[in-house]
Amino acid sequence: MKVAVDAMGGDFAPQSVIEGVLQARSEFTDLDFILYGDQAQIEPLIDDMTRLTIVHTTEKIASDDEPVRAIRRKKQASMVLAAQAVKDGQADALFSLGNTGALLAAGLFIIGRVKGIDRPGLMPTLPSINSDQGFNMLDVGANAEAKPEHLHQYGLMGNFYAKDVRGIENPRIALLNNGTEATKGDELHKATYQLLADDPDLNFVGNVEANDLLKGVADVVVTDGFTGNATLKAIEGTATIVMSQVKHAIMDAGVKEKIGGLLLRGSVGGIREKFDTSIYGGAVLLGLKAPVIKAHGAADARTVYYTVKQIHAMLANQTVQKVIDYFSDQAAQKNSN
């Protein structure tokens, strides 16, 4: 199994990318890596080239580049070459810490979407206070608008991922809505609710409100990209602010408070670990013909390692192939009827 790596994507590339890949290489001996980027910057970071190949290019896509234009014009960019390798069968998966929009465009226009999937969805794994496994939510920004059929497909794809990668036997699928009752929401959410509820292949548990997301009430939460992106940023922002306020409240206080802070250090550390999303890896662009993973631009080597772990699980369990087979069977059944 081979992974195409955009070694130049991210705030700390290529160092954080290479360090994470080297950690993953030590554990996953059945993975090979093709590193796309500036050879002069990459080589000094590697002592042993076992199962590593460098494809040299100095062109890269910047964080402020217009996504589709960058993919079309920067043909030799590290991200574009990595995506092309997956399309050509030279690699089985792609991951990058670079420009999110550009990676979405590369995945869609170069690698291509699964036949039967109308719109791929971007899906991260988020923390839950009641579980170390967290929960998946999609879409969080690949598509601003959606139809009920799209959200239904997100539920199906998320179901496969939760089973294969997270090891959940019967994932609970929920719909993000403004109330838990079946009649809540606009026409999009009402129609989506019915599609999810009527699907015998899904363990649909109904609507979930945003204030219950972190309580672990579902394993996969389905939403449109606009709502999902806003919700994701609210969760990330809240977690950052809360931990920052706790730290400053202790450090800026008097001696008694600092002593109390020392006594609570273990508990505070546990909370920090609970909201440490690096252990979940990156966000998966589900609905493409191969695994495509986007990790945060500021990700460190630890996050890169867990992202590769994600990819390994998807490849070993043939998650994408299961999605392809499922939607192919669905299309065949429709045609026979």
Curated annotation (Swiss-Prot):
GO terms for cellular component: cytoplasm. The keyword Ligase does not apply. InterPro entries: FA_synthesis, Phospholipid_synth_PlsX-like. Signal peptide: none annotated. Keywords: Cytoplasm, Lipid biosynthesis, Lipid metabolism, Phospholipid biosynthesis, Phospholipid metabolism, Transferase. GO terms for biological process: fatty acid biosynthetic process; phospholipid biosynthetic process. It holds the Pfam family FA_synthesis. Its main location: cytoplasm. It catalyses: a fatty acyl-[ACP] + phosphate = an acyl phosphate + holo-[ACP]. Pathway: Lipid metabolism; phospholipid metabolism. Its EC number is 2.3.1.274. It is found in: Cytoplasm. GO terms for molecular function: phosphate:acyl-[acyl carrier protein] acyltransferase activity. Belongs to the PlsX family. Catalyzes the reversible formation of acyl-phosphate (acyl-PO(4)) from acyl-[acyl-carrier-protein] (acyl-ACP). This enzyme utilizes acyl-ACP as fatty acyl donor, but not acyl-CoA. Homodimer. Probably interacts with PlsY. This is Phosphate acyltransferase. It comes from Latilactobacillus sakei subsp. sakei (strain 23K). The lineage of its organism: Bacteria, Bacillati, Bacillota, Bacilli, Lactobacillales.
